[in-house]
Amino acid sequence: MFIAEELLFSERFLWEGKSYVVHIYRHPARKERCLHMAETELSPGDTIISDGQSAEKALHKQQTVLPLTILSRSLL
């Protein structure tokens, strides 16, 4: 049985004059426990995903890794 993620909210992340959209999803992993995911598409085919036990933790993790991720992509 497939259970789809539920979009909880979206936020904008600003970095060096560019805006990136961060989508926060909840995925029911088990009966009592849910997994939260933050997803940001940097370009077609280049998506960054972070997870956490809460929406806030997933968002915080994504906001922490995005600057490094964006900078590393600019080096390629």
Pin down the residues of each PLM region:
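Negatively charged, low-complexity tracts enriched in Asp/Glu with abundant Ser/Thr
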Residues: 1-23
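Compositionally biased, intrinsically disordered low-complexity segments
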Residues: 6, 25-27, 73
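Intrinsic disorder/low-complexity segments in short proteins, especially the signal peptide
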Residues: 12-13, 29, 64, 71
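Mixed-charge, Lys/Arg-enriched low-complexity segments
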Residues: 43-76
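Short aromatic-glycine-(Arg/Gly/Cys) micro-motifs in beta-strand/loop hairpins
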Residues: 26-47
